[in-house]
Amino acid sequence: MTTNATHACRVRPKFPEKWHVPNDPKMWITWRHANNKLAKEKVYWISTASRQGRPHAAPVWGIWKANRFYFETDPNSVKGRNLSNNQSIVVHVQDGNDTVILEGSARGEKRAERLNQLRKDYMRKYQYTPDWSNELNQIVFRVEPRIVRLEGSPNA
């Protein structure tokens, strides 16, 4: 599924028959379900890669808003350094039985209006007010998903 939400197509990947995965689109997870799951999740896992391709996975707090994922990190952390050289990223929720996986690219979010709104969102969701006044200490990344994978049961 792509995140052009109004024009998203639902495609069922091929599974081995022995897995008995339903081929009925009514049984597939809906975008509404995935969107709600992404919005309500507290801890997300991200995977980045170094310039040499070495993978790195880390848990982060984040905000899902308007089909974008936002998170903060220290620019000198492994994930911060990786993203400064390689913008490719994978984001997924913790629940392995009801999984939403995003693949895309991450760029620094610098729009003051968006950062002000995200600060409020962090406070509401985590009872935490971030300080993004100095990008040498914390940077906010915006993830633009290209591919969204949904796995599991919508009733999980």
PLM region spans:
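Short, conserved active-site entrance elements at the starts or edges of catalytic domains
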Residues: 17-55
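Generic structural signal for secondary-structure transition and capping sites
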Residues: 42-43, 88, 127, 148
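Short beta-strand segments
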Residues: 41-75, 81-83, 89-93, 101-103
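Short, intrinsically disordered, mixed-charge
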Residues: 84-89, 120, 124
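Short secondary-structure boundary/capping segments
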Residues: 35-36, 61, 81, 92, ...
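Charged, gly/pro-rich active-site loop segments
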Residues: 2-29, 98-156
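A generic secondary-structure signal marking the coil-to-beta-strand transition
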Residues: 34, 42, 67, 98, ...
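Amphipathic alpha-helical interface surfaces
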Residues: 34, 79, 114-118
